[in-house]
Protein backbone atom coordinates (compact mmCIF):
# COMPACT_ATOMS: atom_id res chain seq x y z
CA UNK A 1 0.00 0.00 0.00
CA UNK A 2 1.30 3.42 -0.91
CA UNK A 3 2.15 5.70 1.96
CA UNK A 4 -0.72 8.04 2.72
CA UNK A 5 0.15 11.70 2.69
CA UNK A 6 -1.42 14.99 3.64
CA UNK A 7 -2.00 17.60 0.99
CA UNK A 8 -3.49 20.82 2.31
CA UNK A 9 -4.94 22.88 -0.54
CA UNK A 10 -5.54 25.94 1.55
CA UNK A 11 -5.97 28.07 -1.56
CA UNK A 12 -2.93 29.11 -0.10
CA UNK A 13 0.00 27.58 -0.40
CA UNK A 14 1.68 27.18 -3.77
CA UNK A 15 2.75 30.79 -4.19
CA UNK A 16 -0.67 32.37 -4.38
CA UNK A 17 -1.83 33.59 -0.99
CA UNK A 18 -0.80 33.62 2.60
CA UNK A 19 -2.29 30.87 4.73
CA UNK A 20 -4.41 33.42 6.54
CA UNK A 21 -6.67 34.63 3.76
CA UNK A 22 -8.36 33.21 0.68
CA UNK A 23 -9.09 35.71 -2.06
CA UNK A 24 -11.06 33.35 -4.25
CA UNK A 25 -14.18 33.28 -2.15
CA UNK A 26 -15.65 36.21 -4.03
CA UNK A 27 -15.57 34.19 -7.23
CA UNK A 28 -17.44 31.23 -5.80
CA UNK A 29 -20.61 30.45 -7.71
CA UNK A 30 -23.88 29.31 -6.21
CA UNK A 31 -24.85 27.24 -9.25
CA UNK A 32 -25.46 23.54 -8.77
CA UNK A 33 -24.69 20.77 -11.24
CA UNK A 34 -28.36 19.86 -11.26
CA UNK A 35 -29.16 23.32 -12.65
CA UNK A 36 -27.72 22.25 -16.01
CA UNK A 37 -29.85 20.21 -18.37
CA UNK A 38 -26.98 18.06 -19.67
CA UNK A 39 -25.80 16.94 -16.23
CA UNK A 40 -26.49 13.21 -15.84
CA UNK A 41 -26.94 12.04 -12.24
CA UNK A 42 -26.33 8.43 -13.33
CA UNK A 43 -23.09 9.03 -15.24
CA UNK A 44 -19.69 7.87 -13.98
CA UNK A 45 -18.69 11.49 -13.48
CA UNK A 46 -21.77 12.53 -11.47
CA UNK A 47 -20.16 12.96 -8.04
CA UNK A 48 -16.98 14.56 -9.37
CA UNK A 49 -18.74 17.07 -11.60
CA UNK A 50 -21.25 17.88 -8.87
CA UNK A 51 -18.43 18.62 -6.42
CA UNK A 52 -16.60 20.82 -8.94
CA UNK A 53 -19.70 22.81 -9.91
CA UNK A 54 -21.29 23.05 -6.47
CA UNK A 55 -18.05 24.38 -4.99
CA UNK A 56 -17.47 26.98 -7.66
CA UNK A 57 -14.56 25.43 -9.56
CA UNK A 58 -16.27 24.37 -12.80
CA UNK A 59 -18.60 26.80 -14.56
CA UNK A 60 -21.15 26.06 -17.24
CA UNK A 61 -20.52 26.59 -20.94
CA UNK A 62 -23.81 28.48 -20.94
CA UNK A 63 -26.58 29.15 -18.45
CA UNK A 64 -28.10 25.74 -19.20
CA UNK A 65 -25.25 23.48 -20.32
CA UNK A 66 -22.12 22.07 -18.68
CA UNK A 67 -20.84 20.00 -21.61
CA UNK A 68 -19.21 17.44 -19.28
CA UNK A 69 -18.09 15.22 -22.16
CA UNK A 70 -16.67 18.09 -24.17
CA UNK A 71 -12.97 18.86 -24.39
CA UNK A 72 -11.54 21.25 -21.84
CA UNK A 73 -9.58 24.16 -23.29
CA UNK A 74 -6.27 25.44 -22.01
CA UNK A 75 -7.94 28.67 -20.89
CA UNK A 76 -10.70 26.83 -19.01
CA UNK A 77 -8.16 24.76 -17.11
CA UNK A 78 -6.14 27.84 -16.22
CA UNK A 79 -9.29 29.42 -14.79
CA UNK A 80 -10.07 26.38 -12.63
CA UNK A 81 -6.53 26.20 -11.26
CA UNK A 82 -6.66 29.91 -10.42
CA UNK A 83 -10.04 29.59 -8.70
CA UNK A 84 -8.73 26.67 -6.68
CA UNK A 85 -5.59 28.34 -5.42
CA UNK A 86 -6.81 31.92 -5.18
CA UNK A 87 -3.99 33.35 -7.25
CA UNK A 88 -3.73 37.12 -7.57
CA UNK A 89 -0.32 37.96 -9.08
CA UNK A 90 -0.23 38.32 -12.85
CA UNK A 91 2.62 37.94 -15.30
CA UNK A 92 3.40 40.02 -18.36
CA UNK A 93 2.05 37.86 -21.19
CA UNK A 94 2.41 40.37 -24.00
CA UNK A 95 4.71 37.93 -25.81
CA UNK A 96 1.74 35.64 -26.48
CA UNK A 97 0.13 37.21 -29.51
CA UNK A 98 -2.92 34.94 -29.40
CA UNK A 99 -4.08 36.07 -25.94
CA UNK A 100 -6.16 39.17 -26.45
CA UNK A 101 -6.82 41.55 -23.57
CA UNK A 102 -10.47 41.59 -24.63
CA UNK A 103 -10.93 37.87 -23.95
CA UNK A 104 -12.46 36.62 -20.69
CA UNK A 105 -9.44 34.46 -20.01
CA UNK A 106 -6.71 37.09 -20.37
CA UNK A 107 -6.21 37.52 -16.63
CA UNK A 108 -6.49 33.77 -15.97
CA UNK A 109 -3.68 33.07 -18.43
CA UNK A 110 -1.57 35.81 -16.85
CA UNK A 111 -2.20 34.32 -13.40
CA UNK A 112 -1.33 30.80 -14.56
CA UNK A 113 1.93 31.93 -16.16
CA UNK A 114 2.92 33.80 -13.00
CA UNK A 115 2.09 30.75 -10.88
CA UNK A 116 4.36 28.63 -13.06
CA UNK A 117 1.70 26.13 -14.08
CA UNK A 118 1.51 27.25 -17.71
CA UNK A 119 4.01 27.66 -20.51
CA UNK A 120 3.21 28.67 -24.05
CA UNK A 121 2.94 26.28 -26.97
CA UNK A 122 5.75 28.41 -28.39
CA UNK A 123 7.51 31.63 -27.46
CA UNK A 124 4.68 33.64 -28.99
CA UNK A 125 1.65 31.34 -28.76
CA UNK A 126 -0.38 30.16 -25.76
CA UNK A 127 -3.23 28.55 -27.75
CA UNK A 128 -5.79 29.38 -25.04
CA UNK A 129 -8.78 28.17 -27.05
CA UNK A 130 -7.17 24.86 -27.99
CA UNK A 131 -8.12 21.64 -26.19
CA UNK A 132 -5.63 20.57 -23.55
CA UNK A 133 -4.24 17.05 -23.67
CA UNK A 134 -4.29 14.64 -20.78
CA UNK A 135 -0.51 14.80 -20.36
CA UNK A 136 -0.65 18.60 -20.39
CA UNK A 137 -3.39 18.51 -17.76
CA UNK A 138 -1.36 16.17 -15.56
CA UNK A 139 1.60 18.51 -15.93
CA UNK A 140 -0.41 21.58 -14.92
CA UNK A 141 -1.90 19.90 -11.84
CA UNK A 142 1.42 18.40 -10.75
CA UNK A 143 3.04 21.83 -10.98
CA UNK A 144 0.19 23.44 -9.06
CA UNK A 145 0.48 20.86 -6.28
CA UNK A 146 4.27 21.13 -6.29
CA UNK A 147 4.61 17.37 -6.31
CA UNK A 148 8.12 16.11 -5.65
CA UNK A 149 8.98 14.68 -9.06
CA UNK A 150 12.21 13.10 -7.85
CA UNK A 151 10.39 10.99 -5.27
CA UNK A 152 8.14 9.61 -8.02
CA UNK A 153 10.88 9.09 -10.62
CA UNK A 154 10.63 5.31 -10.31
CA UNK A 155 6.84 5.10 -10.51
CA UNK A 156 6.00 1.97 -12.50
CA UNK A 157 3.98 2.73 -15.61
CA UNK A 158 4.22 -0.77 -17.08
CA UNK A 159 0.50 -1.38 -16.51
CA UNK A 160 -0.25 1.14 -19.26
CA UNK A 161 0.21 -0.18 -22.78
CA UNK A 162 0.60 3.31 -24.26
CA UNK A 163 3.27 4.57 -21.86
CA UNK A 164 5.70 5.05 -24.76
CA UNK A 165 3.41 7.79 -26.10
CA UNK A 166 4.13 10.06 -23.12
CA UNK A 167 6.29 12.98 -24.22
CA UNK A 168 9.66 13.23 -22.51
CA UNK A 169 8.87 16.67 -21.09
CA UNK A 170 5.66 15.34 -19.51
CA UNK A 171 7.02 12.07 -18.15
CA UNK A 172 8.12 13.35 -14.69
CA UNK A 173 4.71 14.94 -14.14
CA UNK A 174 2.77 11.90 -15.34
CA UNK A 175 4.84 9.65 -13.07
CA UNK A 176 4.14 11.97 -10.15
CA UNK A 177 0.38 12.05 -10.75
CA UNK A 178 0.20 8.27 -11.12
CA UNK A 179 2.50 7.72 -8.15
CA UNK A 180 0.39 10.03 -5.99
CA UNK A 181 -2.72 7.98 -6.88
CA UNK A 182 -4.41 10.92 -8.58
CA UNK A 183 -4.47 9.34 -12.05
CA UNK A 184 -5.30 5.75 -12.92
CA UNK A 185 -5.94 6.01 -16.63
CA UNK A 186 -8.66 4.74 -18.90
CA UNK A 187 -8.39 1.09 -18.07
CA UNK A 188 -5.00 -0.09 -19.34
CA UNK A 189 -4.13 3.14 -21.13
CA UNK A 190 -3.20 6.64 -20.01
CA UNK A 191 -4.15 8.19 -23.36
CA UNK A 192 -1.61 10.99 -22.79
CA UNK A 193 -2.14 12.60 -26.18
CA UNK A 194 -5.94 12.56 -26.07
CA UNK A 195 -7.78 15.72 -25.11
CA UNK A 196 -9.04 15.72 -21.54
CA UNK A 197 -12.77 16.20 -21.08
CA UNK A 198 -14.33 18.56 -18.59
CA UNK A 199 -15.68 15.60 -16.63
CA UNK A 200 -12.29 13.89 -16.54
CA UNK A 201 -10.66 17.01 -15.16
CA UNK A 202 -13.38 17.29 -12.54
CA UNK A 203 -12.58 13.69 -11.59
CA UNK A 204 -8.91 14.52 -11.08
CA UNK A 205 -9.88 17.23 -8.60
CA UNK A 206 -12.32 14.85 -6.95
CA UNK A 207 -9.47 12.38 -6.49
CA UNK A 208 -7.38 15.05 -4.82
CA UNK A 209 -9.80 17.05 -2.69
CA UNK A 210 -11.47 15.24 0.19
CA UNK A 211 -13.02 18.21 1.98
CA UNK A 212 -14.34 21.60 0.87
CA UNK A 213 -14.60 24.31 3.52
CA UNK A 214 -17.12 26.91 2.35
CA UNK A 215 -18.20 28.63 5.57
CA UNK A 216 -16.30 30.83 8.02
CA UNK A 217 -15.52 29.44 11.44
CA UNK A 218 -13.44 27.00 13.46
CA UNK A 219 -13.41 23.39 12.34
CA UNK A 220 -12.66 21.05 15.20
CA UNK A 221 -14.36 17.96 13.79
CA UNK A 222 -12.49 15.21 12.01
CA UNK A 223 -11.53 16.27 8.49
CA UNK A 224 -10.91 13.60 5.87
CA UNK A 225 -8.63 13.93 2.88
CA UNK A 226 -7.12 16.99 1.26
CA UNK A 227 -8.67 20.35 2.04
CA UNK A 228 -9.78 23.17 -0.23
CA UNK A 229 -10.79 26.32 1.64
CA UNK A 230 -13.28 28.45 -0.29
CA UNK A 231 -13.69 31.30 2.19
CA UNK A 232 -11.69 33.39 4.63
CA UNK A 233 -11.66 33.49 8.45
CA UNK A 234 -11.24 29.74 8.84
CA UNK A 235 -9.41 28.02 11.69
CA UNK A 236 -8.53 24.34 11.43
CA UNK A 237 -7.49 21.93 14.14
CA UNK A 238 -4.85 20.24 12.01
CA UNK A 239 -4.39 17.35 14.41
CA UNK A 240 -7.85 16.18 13.41
CA UNK A 241 -7.13 15.86 9.71
CA UNK A 242 -7.10 12.30 8.41
CA UNK A 243 -6.09 11.04 4.99
CA UNK A 244 -8.06 8.56 2.94
CA UNK A 245 -7.24 6.93 -0.38
CA UNK A 246 -8.53 8.96 -3.35
CA UNK A 247 -11.23 7.73 -5.69
CA UNK A 248 -9.76 6.09 -8.75
CA UNK A 249 -10.14 7.68 -12.15
Model region roles, listed by residue range:
Residues 225, 229-231, 238:
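Residues on the solvent-exposed faces and adjacent turns
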Residues 2-46, 54, 59-107, 114-138, ...:
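Feature responds to low-complexity, polar/acidic, surface-exposed segments characteristic
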Amino acid sequence: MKKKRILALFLAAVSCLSLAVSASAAGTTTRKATDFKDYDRTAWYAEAVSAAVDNGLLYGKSSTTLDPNGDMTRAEMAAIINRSFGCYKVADISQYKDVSKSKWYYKDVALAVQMGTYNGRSNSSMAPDAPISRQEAMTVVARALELDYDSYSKTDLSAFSDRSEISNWALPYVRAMVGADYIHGRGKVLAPLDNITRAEFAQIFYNIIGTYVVSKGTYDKDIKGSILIRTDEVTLQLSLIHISEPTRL
